[in-house]
């Protein structure tokens, strides 16, 4: 994509680019979990929608179930990219991106390799350990942007020490992201839902695998969905790529597979309530103003769900069949309760960070291209 300008918030950054816009995504990946991958996929899809000729590339664990039949170019590595620094460095050298986005993945050597090629470097953290890593001085000197993948009211604002470090170095730019919503894909959603129609309840338990630090599984969500359907409501269960268990489908309960972010957004928007885990999809649903019943499914999620409940933004029942079922039925049967919960969600003010992030990626790519052009002339 030979661009003469990037359109960004605040005007046009004029920038002659001698080569295509190239963005490399390095999300943590593996046989279980997919939140980081899903966020990176949404960003990549949105970049392609805004700049159709953009070149994207991913580095993914070859055993990740979503790595099969992925619609963006990808290099598959034998473990999570954090453990494959040599392979990541090789991809950086060959692909020569203007922007590299590490999402909870990467080691110092990979970040340095990106800087050496002239790329701008973004790091996304969603857990305390990764946030701590990104606030080490040697990493702060390598990063242009540090995105914390939850709002400050949930993740906690910058601490005194973090603020002092930012003031000392003057970098990186720190951003708290409420969530990243993929552009809506109405045709894909309609294809998925076919003759079933839009559901009363959308169930999204995550990537489909069980986490080692939790007894809760996606199968529990499927059983709850079947129970809700038995009360006469239409329920759609989004089976993540690692979900292999069978479910008893009917004219009231359907299982959806290979649901991309744009289709998921439409399904979230059209459902009456959402039964969801405590990961990224919860924040996506809240940004859309949906009434949610949230049940954590991994060790980092209980605190997040509890905080959302404290804000009055979700229903957070005990993870027991009767309690979860009753909360869902209450919201379905009592429209006043559902509307009141939606009003509280809107009052909290969760927002989609995607437009701002796309603008920033465009700005960083322009900066990288300008710096490369200067180096080539000198």
Regions found by a protein language model. Give the residues of each.
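Conserved donor-nucleotide binding/catalytic region of nucleotide-linked donor-dependent transferases
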Residues: 321, 327-346, 367-371
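A nucleotide-sugar donor-handling region in carbohydrate enzymes
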Residues: 142-207, 240-242
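Short acidic-hydrophobic, aromatic-tinged amphipathic segments that line or gate anion-handling sites
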Residues: 76-80, 256-258, 315-320
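C-terminal alpha-helical cap of glycosyltransferases
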Residues: 350-378
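Active-site and donor-binding regions of nucleotide-sugar-utilizing enzymes
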Residues: 24-50, 57-164
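A donor-sugar binding/catalytic signature common to diverse glycosyltransferases
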Residues: 102-103, 263-304
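Donor-nucleotide binding loops and adjacent catalytic segments primarily
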Residues: 191-270
């Amino acid at each position: 994509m030979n661009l003469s300008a990037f359109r960004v918030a605040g005007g046009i950054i004029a920038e002659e680019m001698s080569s295509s816009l190239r963005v490399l995504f390095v999300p943590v990946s593996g046989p279980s979990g997919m939140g980081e991958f899903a966020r990176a996929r949404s960003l990549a899809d949105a970049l392609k929608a805004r700049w159709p000729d953009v070149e994207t590339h991913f580095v993914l664990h070859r055993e990740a179930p979503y790595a099969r039949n992925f619609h963006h170019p990808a290099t598959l590595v034998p473990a999570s990219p954090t453990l494959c620094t040599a392979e990541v460095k090789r991809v950086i050298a060959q692909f020569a991106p203007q922007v590299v986005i590490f999402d909870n993945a990467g080691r110092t050597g990979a970040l340095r390799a990106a800087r050496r090629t002239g790329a701008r470097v973004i790091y996304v953290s969603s857990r305390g350990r990764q946030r701590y890593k990104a606030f080490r001085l040697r990493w702060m000197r390598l990063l242009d942007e540090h995105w914390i993948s939850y709002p400050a009211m949930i993740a906690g604002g910058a601490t005194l020490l973090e603020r002092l470090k930012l003031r000392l170095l003057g970098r990186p730019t720190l951003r708290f992201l409420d969530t990243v919503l993929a552009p809506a894909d109405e045709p894909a959603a309609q294809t998925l839902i076919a003759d079933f129609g839009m559901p009363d309840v959308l169930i999204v338990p995550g990537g489909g695998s069980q986490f080692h630090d939790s007894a809760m599984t996606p199968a529990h969500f499927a059983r709850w969905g079947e129970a809700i359907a038995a009360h006469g409501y239409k329920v759609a269960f989004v089976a993540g790529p690692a979900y292999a268990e069978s479910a008893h489908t009917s004219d009231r309960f359907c299982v959806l597979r290979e649901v991309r972010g744009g289709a998921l957004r439409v399904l979230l928007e059209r459902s009456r309530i959402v039964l969801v885990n405590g990961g990224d999809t919860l924040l996506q649903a809240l940004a859309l103003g949906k009434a949610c019943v949230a049940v954590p499914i991994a060790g980092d999620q209980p605190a997040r769900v509890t905080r959302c409940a404290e804000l009055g933004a979700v229903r957070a029942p005990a993870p027991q069949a009767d309690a979860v079922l009753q909360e869902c039925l209450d919201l379905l049967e009592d429209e006043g309760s559902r509307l009141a919960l939606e009003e509280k969600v809107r009052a909290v003010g969760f927002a989609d960070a995607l437009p701002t992030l796309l603008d920033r990626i465009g700005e960083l790519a322009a900066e990288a291209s300008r710096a490369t052009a200067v180096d080539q002339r000198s």
